[in-house]
Structure formats: C-alpha cells, structure tokens
Amino acid sequence: DLTAVIDSMGLCLFTSFALGAPEYTKLLNAACGTEYTPEDVLEIGERIYNIERMFNKAAGMKPEDDRLPKRLLSEPIPEGPSKGMTSKLEITLPEYYEVRGWVNAFPTDETLKRLGLDECIGK
C-alpha cells in the first residue's frame, strides 16, 4: 500500500526503501498542507491499489493473468538463505487475496465498500 502512495507522489520507488510510512506522511503533509497520519496514508495506498486492480479488471485482466514468470516457479534459488526454494504461488496467492479482501484476483464488494469505493462495486 505504501508503494502505491510513493508512486502517486511521483517519487522513485528504487530509492524509497530507506524511508517508511511516517517519513512519507511528513513529506506528503508538507507538500499538501494536510494532517494525515501514517495510518491514513496506508489506507490511501490501499484505496489506490484496489482502484488500480479494478481498472485492470475493466481492461480485461483475468485471474489467470496474476502470475509470476515461469522461471520463478520452477527454477530453485541458487544460493543464499533461500537456496533450493521456488515460489509456492499456488499456496501464497489465495492467502494474499484473502488478506487483501479479494476473491479471484479482485476486491470484493465488501472491501470496496469499506474503502469508500462504492463507485467500483459491481463492475
């Protein structure tokens, strides 16, 4: 969710990992004259990410399009602490959807309503 905010702020994602939500909140408040909390900013990011997902759905994205490159699913990691492991996307993706409040790759109507995105419901 923070990544969506960083992208929306027009900042470089590659250099963003040195800062966290509190620092980006201060930057956003200074630039916009707002008084957001880090929690507010993360919710804004969650809203952005869900809107992006609904845009992708409207553009024709299907659940089967939500995948990693075949190499990451079949080639074991060659070295380091994760040596020998491959991605278990078939296990982790449904768990990720559940945590996000999504079903089959897209936000549920309940998630959209919770985020105040009523205009996206049923689309």
Label each residue range with its predicted role.
Residues D1-K123:
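Extended C-terminal regions of large enzymes
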